[in-house]
Amino acid sequence: VIVVGAAYAAMMILFVLATRTTTAANAIFLQSTAPLYLILLGPLLLREPIRREDILLIAVLALGISLFFISSEKPAATAPNPFLGNILAVTSGIGWALTIAGLRWIGRGKSGAEGSLATVAAGNALAFLIALPMAFPVERVDWRSLSVVVYLGVFQIGLAYVCLTHGLRKVPAFEASTILLLETALNPCWAWAVHGERPGGLALAGGVIIVGATIVNTWWRTQRAGADS
């Protein structure tokens, strides 16, 4: 529980730092490369073998990732250091893969959903303790700021991960990661609508490759599972 909670905390903190230093699209797209790391970690952590089609997916996802680093995005108000932010986002994706694999492993055990919820709670508590010094000094507190914090804590984090921990008991780790791509697809749209943030062309191409490859792979797995049954 502690180890998976630490991976969860690292993923959360790294993703927040990534969104502060690169574009929202880059951060969410690169974090969504978690399926790549799940494929590599599957045989070790979950005893899920690597299939031939997984090797092709690894190559396509690696191509998508490379486009983010080839893209020469200039620093902006919402993305002061795109290169560093991209690295943080990739690392966050590794933490996300470890979290999904760990929650899946815990969900298979005797503790079930209770163990998964305890892990998420421990991860949030650890993330809070690590990030607490960054909150000081407190310059201004208003109702708008408090309402955003409450919304993020209750809905964006709390309710979302309650649903996630229950769902991971019934959905394979790889498919769970790809189902969550809806957030990935909508995130750049919200960032553009609210902040006017526009990622570079190569970054968008990399994001399309990553999302498209995982969707196709999930569809292929679903079709094959149906044929086998």
Language model features: what each stretch is:
Residues 1-26, 30-31, 66-67, 153-171:
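Specific transmembrane alpha-helical segments of multi-pass solute transporters/efflux pumps
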Residues 5, 9, 13, 35-40, ...:
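Hydrophobic/small/kink-forming positions within alpha-helical transmembrane segments
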Residues 8, 40, 50-72, 124-126, ...:
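Hydrophobic transmembrane alpha-helices of multi-pass small-molecule transport proteins
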Residues 13, 62-79, 125-147, 192-193, ...:
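Membrane-interface helix-cap regions at the ends of transmembrane helices
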Residues 17-34, 82-94, 143-157, 208:
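Structural signature of hydrophobic alpha-helical transmembrane segments
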Residues 18, 23, 44-46, 50, ...:
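Hydrophobic/aromatic residues within transmembrane alpha-helices
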Residues 27-33, 103-126, 157-193:
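Helix-helix packing/entry segments at the starts of transmembrane helices
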Residues 38-40, 75-138, 149, 229:
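Transmembrane alpha-helical segments that form core, pore/gating elements
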